[in-house]
């Protein structure tokens, strides 16, 4: 089936299954091979295909979906050139069309003769597979559905050129590989360096879900929108009291601008040594990346802030235009200052240098946004709006009376406290006297 002639789409992850299946296609009727061994390989391959499909949540024609999955997952010179921007000019199209002709042949392969020789049972199953629970562990339903829809569209193509056009359109709309198919990522440190790993389950929070803080949200939106649109933008620090919606606002920003090419990588301060490696992996991709640091703060003895300052400020190499850093913190100045610091400054000749070194990290964030605790009237408004969204059948007087009792024993007034109160009410069936 000419898979050994692929130019761009080679050395694919999960490609062993393709090698086994094409070997069967080419040799199922070859007398040189033992028929029982060939049957064993066929059912082993069908088993591997089924396992992969269950883990990814695939349904329908598993062979078509598997081939589609290979194409949308493989990062090569053609696919990464087309992500977000669409069709490109140049000789790379010749190599791409060559490979898509081979994939088209694989799509159109008729398994009937192979099934008559080696057995039809397993092949019938993979032609119209029904999933167990409708979702997988690797992809969320949104990604799974896009891949399955593309597989169906490719099944209807009449030529390799049309086949290539549909795959390229997918690259433009949704991207390619893990950075294209997923919204959010975390970092794993390996012996080879930093590895970017997709986060498949993320909160589906949206900015409209966050009650209040309109000025703060607008400032965050304006900066992020400028970044996504390729205009000048700044690193952003969201600071203020706990439970006021800082982290939720960041997650909401990702959900709002994902379709415009925004991606987010969560990094913890013990991973700051990997930041340069991470940036090197993403700087040439056609996406906009926010490196997200939640609850960022440093004790007086911690020096990781120096790594962060160096990355933000940059050395000889300019920080890529497609990377920003967003952080949340309960501290305005990020680094805790103690009375000992003041005593040390009394003994140090260059007192101002010591102060500036510790405070200069905040200056690296061009946009700072304050999220303060709501006043009583604002807190009550948040409670009322959340109650309305959850269809709670209490009068406003009853609701606010219970909310006041709740906040006194649950950390004071904040958006988080209001949400926890509403979640508590929504979980009860009638009696609210035990709050």
Model-derived regions: residue spans:
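Walker A/P-loop
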Residues: 235-265, 277-284
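Conserved nucleotide-sensing/catalytic segment adjacent to the nucleotide-binding pocket
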Residues: 263-265, 276-320
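Interdomain "pre-motor" coupling segment immediately N-terminal to P-loop NTPase/helicase cores
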Residues: 133-196
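C-terminal alpha-helical "lid" subdomain
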Residues: 368, 372-435
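Conserved catalytic/switch belt of AAA+ P-loop NTPases
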Residues: 299-349, 353
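Intrinsically disordered, low-complexity N-terminal extensions of AAA+/P-loop NTPases
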Residues: 1-153
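N-terminal pre-Walker A segment at the start of P-loop NTPase domains
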Residues: 199-225
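Conserved AAA+ ATPase "SRH/arginine-finger" region at the nucleotide-binding site
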Residues: 346-359, 366-380
């Amino acid at each position: 089936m000419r898979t050994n002639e692929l130019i761009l789409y080679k050395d694919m992850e999960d490609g062993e299954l393709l090698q086994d299946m094409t070997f069967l296609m080419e040799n199922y009727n070859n007398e040189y091979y033992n028929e029982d061994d060939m049957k064993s390989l066929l059912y082993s391959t069908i088993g591997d295909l089924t396992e992969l499909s269950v883990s990814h949540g695939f349904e329908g024609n598993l062979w078509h979906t598997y081939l589609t999955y290979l194409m949308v997952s493989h990062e090569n010179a053609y696919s990464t050139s087309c992500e977000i921007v669409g069709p490109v000019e140049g000789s790379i199209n010749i190599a791409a069309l060559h490979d898509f002709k081979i994939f088209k042949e694989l799509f159109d392969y008729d398994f009937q003769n192979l099934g008559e020789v080696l057995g039809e049972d397993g092949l019938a199953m993979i032609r119209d597979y029904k999933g167990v629970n409708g979702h997988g562990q690797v992809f969320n339903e949104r990604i799974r559905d896009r891949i399955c829809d593309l597989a169906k569209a490719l099944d209807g193509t009449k030529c390799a050129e049309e086949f290539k056009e549909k795959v390229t359109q997918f690259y433009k709309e949704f991207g390619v590989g893990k950075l294209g198919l997923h919204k959010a990522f975390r970092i794993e440190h390996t012996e080879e360096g930093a590895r970017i790993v997709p986060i498949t389950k993320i909160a589906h929070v949206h900015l409209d879900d966050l009650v209040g803080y309109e000025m703060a949200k607008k400032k965050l939106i304006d900066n992020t929108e400028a970044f996504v649109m390729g205009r000048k933008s700044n690193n952003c620090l969201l600071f203020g009291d706990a439970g006021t919606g800082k982290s939720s606002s960041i997650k909401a920003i990702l959900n709002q601008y994902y379709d415009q090419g925004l991606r987010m990588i969560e990094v913890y301060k013990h991973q700051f040594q990997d930041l340069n490696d991470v940036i090197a992996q993403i700087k040439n991709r056609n996406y906009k990346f926010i490196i997200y640091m939640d609850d960022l703060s440093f004790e007086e003895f911690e020096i990781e802030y120096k790594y962060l300052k160096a990355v933000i400020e940059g050395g000889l190499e300019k920080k890529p235009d497609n990377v920003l850093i967003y952080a949340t913190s309960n501290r305005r100045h990020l680094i805790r200052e103690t009375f000992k610091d003041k005593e040390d400054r009394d003994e140090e000749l260059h007192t101002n240098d010591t102060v500036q070194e510790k405070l200069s990290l905040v200056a690296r964030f061009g946009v700072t946004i304050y999220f303060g605790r709501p006043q009583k009237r604002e807190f009550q408004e948040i409670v009322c709006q959340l109650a309305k969204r959850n269809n709670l059948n209490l009068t406003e007087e009853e609701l606010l009376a219970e909310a006041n009792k709740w906040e006194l024993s649950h950390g004071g007034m904040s958006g988080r406290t209001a949400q926890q109160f509403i979640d508590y009410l929504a979980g009860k069936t009638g009696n609210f006297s035990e709050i």
